[in-house]
Swiss-Prot record:
The chain crosses the membrane at residues 23-44, 58-81, 93-114, 135-159, 180-203, 234-257, 267-288. Glycans are attached at residue 4. Keywords: Cell membrane, Disulfide bond, G-protein coupled receptor, Glycoprotein, Lipoprotein, Membrane, Palmitate, Receptor, Transducer, Transmembrane, Transmembrane helix. The lineage of its organism: Eukaryota, Metazoa, Chordata, Craniata, Vertebrata. This is Histamine H2 receptor.
């Protein structure tokens, strides 16, 4: 009886673990899809968000949405069964989509950091530096790199050790990695963007602190300290999430290229892979919900008040415009909120004339 009881207990533990993993992966997929759908809807329904700055956020949301729809369901099935049941041809398509969309997601994050670096370090020349043509070129660059490292490399066998497409085991489906592909993909997709993002966000943080000190004479010391704290927390969340989610995966990826595809345990490989996928679920929160305009759009979206809000805002502007300048200045400051270059970090920029931009 004892051996049978032990086997039964192991089966129950295995089933409980599989159910737990299924719930976690399903929740992650639903959050990824729902969060990025909300970002796309917010931009499509709110004209205020249709700006060049938000082009990269929309591109990021669309990329992560495609990842949640086209890749994550098959990854979850494979993770739970440890068996690929969809054939060799679809395996190549699946792995190519996986690499392409993950690469595009990371490169979009990289472009967002460069965009905000230009906005903070040189706000007066920002409209000259960031033009529709340059944004379009940047988006084309993202997808050219992503397609080259995914569909082109995998279907031509550049990533495999023997130069063939796909592996020999028809019941397994994962990206093969040789030395050159592992190093090139790791550097282009993660390590170089990570280095540049660290530099840009450090510069943004320094400027945010300087601005907080500069407006210290206008507002209380406590308010300036709170603004600086918010900027620190936001930047730490953005970089922390990116590093925690992707660093383990690309470390394992490069290690596989150097040591062989079977150098890492499948369970560990699955954990670091889904940790990277989790970044696509966090992006709508980190890059949209922390932005004041996006938060307002989310509230409007969930309460279905786009029309009433816009009409109310228009009436306020018309009423303020009819008042004398001396009488309407304070009301316009609170209600109208003129066109601004908002930095998502939560720290206020300073207008050339000395007025803070909220």
């Amino acid at each position: 009886m004892e051996p049978n009881g032990t086997v039964h207990s192991c089966c129950l533990d295995s089933m409980a673990l599989k159910v737990t993993i299924s719930v976690v992966l399903t929740t992650l997929i639903l959050i990824t899809i729902a969060g990025n759908v909300v970002v796309c809807l917010a931009v499509s329904l709110n004209r205020r968000l249709r700006s060049l700055t938000n082009c990269f956020i929309v591109s990021l949301a669309a990329t992560d949405l495609l990842l949640g729809l086209l890749v994550l369901p098959f990854s979850a099935i494979y993770q739970l069964s440890f068996t690929w049941s969809f054939g060799h041809v679809f395996c190549n398509i699946y792995t190519s989509l996986d690499v392409m969309l993950c690469t595009a997601s990371i490169l979009n994050l990289f472009m967002i950091s460069l965009d905000r670096y230009c906005a903070v370090t040189d706000p007066l020349r920002y409209p000259v530096l960031v033009t529709p043509v340059r944004v379009a070129i940047s988006l084309v660059f993202i997808w050219v790199i992503s397609i080259t490292l995914s569909f082109l490399s995998i279907h031509l066998g550049w990533n495999s050790r023997n130069g063939t497409r796909g592996g020999n085991d028809t019941f397994k489906c994962k990206v093969q990695v040789n030395e050159v592909y592992g190093l090139v993909d790791g550097l282009v997709t993660f390590y170089l963007p990570l280095l540049i993002m660290c530099v840009t966000y450090y510069r943004i943080f320094k400027i945010a602190r300087e601005q907080a000190k500069r407006i210290n004479h206008i507002s209380s010391w406590k308010a300036a300290t709170i603004r600086e704290h918010k900027a620190t927390v936001t930047l730490a969340a953005v970089m922390g999430a990116f590093i925690i989610c992707w660093f383990p995966y690309f470390t394992a990826f490069v290690y596989r290229g150097l040591r062989g595809d079977d150098a890492i345990n499948e369970a560990v490989e699955g954990i670091v892979l889904w940790l990277g996928y989790a970044n696509s679920a966090l992006n709508p929160i980190l890059y949209a919900a922390l932005n004041r305009d996006f938060r307002t759009a989310y509230q409007q979206l969930f309460h279905c008040k786009f029309a009433s809000h816009n009409s109310h805002k228009t009436s306020l502007r018309l009423n303020n415009s009819l008042l004398p300048r001396s009488q309407s200045r304070e009301g316009r400051w609170q209600e109208e909120k003129p066109l601004k270059l908002q930095v998502w970090s939560g720290t206020e920029l300073t207008h050339p004339q000395g007025n803070p931009i909220r």
